[in-house]
């Protein structure tokens, strides 16, 4: 009988992250979120909204880098510790992490298009176009770049939808 209990304890310790992870990261926050919705206080609403936003970021990170994270042996335990810090009411980890890192990143202005170079105010379209006007051997601008387009040539090939096409 004692070997059965010992085996059970061994299995629980080996799979602690699998057992405790969903309870700590989903079940308790869900319960606390429902209680926060039903309460009149807005402080707990902010705590749990912040938690769910951070939990979503963690899950997106995991989904993106799953192949890399599966090679890190202690990642499940580190995630469990981080999630516990975010969830536990006395620590307010979610509020701290959001206020000090995520909020400052989201509210700071970001450069979206780093390759955009604005035109100068004194640029003249004619002067700019003159820089790229083709010139002939004497240095004078050419009259016409393309004189005419020959439209007399017809496509002689067949398509797969023609009746005369041989397969």
Swiss-Prot record:
Where in or outside the cell it occurs: the entry states: Membrane
Annotated TM spans: 18-38, 47-67, 68-88
InterPro entries, from UniProt? TB2_DP1_HVA22
GO cellular component terms, alphabetically, are: membrane
Going by the UniProt record, its keywords in alphabetical order are: Membrane, Stress response, Transmembrane, Transmembrane helix
Q: How is the protein disposed in the membrane? A: Multi-pass membrane protein
- What are the BP-aspect GO terms? hyperosmotic salinity response; response to abscisic acid
Induction and repression of expression: By abscisic acid (ABA) and salt stresses.
Tissue pattern of expression reads:
Predominantly expressed in flower buds.
What the record says about family reads: Belongs to the DP1 family.
This protein is called what? HVA22-like protein b
